[in-house]
Regions:
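Pyridoxal 5′-phosphate
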Residues: 16-211
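Single conserved hydrophobic/aromatic residue that forms the stacking wall/gate
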Residues: 1-18, 22
Length: 211
């Protein structure tokens, strides 16, 4: 059994290798608390439900439980009605902009961001894949990423700091953590200019004159 998390812009369809795929709504400009589980029927019927509640059973006896048909088996309790309605709107939002337009916009921003940060000799960009996604991870020698994130937050620049769900990779790179800037449809090149200015502020606060 193999479950794969698909990126927001991909088509959620199980392959011959994957039994199930899932996507999260908040990765698609929607609210939190809802996602998609798209799987092969034989596995969804065989797997036990992850939680119990009203509406997901056919019959309860002292010695056995008969679960409801799919998808009711996995939809216990009150449905997240507001999130479902919002999910529809977030899909329409993405379709109106166009996935290809979003990819093009993010690629241009990341390329610009790399160009800007490469000129800052205190910044080390992590990774440089040919087809880089909408994220840019970096470190500043002498400054912990959590401190970077806190200082940038004071300037209204929101980034993520930590392991980003890949601690093994950070161990391989021999770094305790990293800072990560992510881009979306609402970001501009000016955001990376501000990021660079705030990074220079970090250098001053930590008195990194040698950098």
């Amino acid at each position: 059994f193999l479950m794969i998390r698909r990126p927001p812009r991909s088509t959620p369809k199980p392959s011959s290798a994957a039994s199930d795929v899932y996507k999260r709504q908040h990765k698609m400009y929607g609210p939190t608390g809802l996602g998609i589980l798209y799987g092969k029927k034989k596995w969804l019927e065989e797997l036990p439900p992850y939680q119990g509640g009203g509406g997901m059973i056919k019959e309860v006896k002292k010695d056995r439980i008969t679960y409801g048909d799919l998808p009711n088996k996995y939809e216990a309790g009150t449905m997240a009605t507001a999130q479902v309605i919002a999910f529809d709107q977030s899909i329409k939002f993405l379709e109106n902009i166009g996935i290809e337009n979003i990819i093009k916009h993010e690629k241009e921003l990341i390329e610009y961001g790399q160009e800007v940060l490469r000129k800052n000799n205190s910044v080390k960009i992590i990774g440089n894949p040919k087809n880089k996604g909408g994220v840019l991870s970096f470190t500043i020698e002498g400054v912990h990423p959590h401190d970077i994130a806190t200082i940038l937050d004071e300037d209204g620049v929101a980034i993520r700091a930590g392991h980003h769900c890949c601690q093994i990779l950070h161990d391989k790179l021999e770094i305790p953590a990293s800072a990560r800037a992510s881009v979306g449809v609402y970001n501009t090149k000016e955001d990376f200019d501000q990021l660079n200015e705030s990074i220079n502020k970090c250098k001053k606060i930590f008195d990194l004159k040698w950098i």
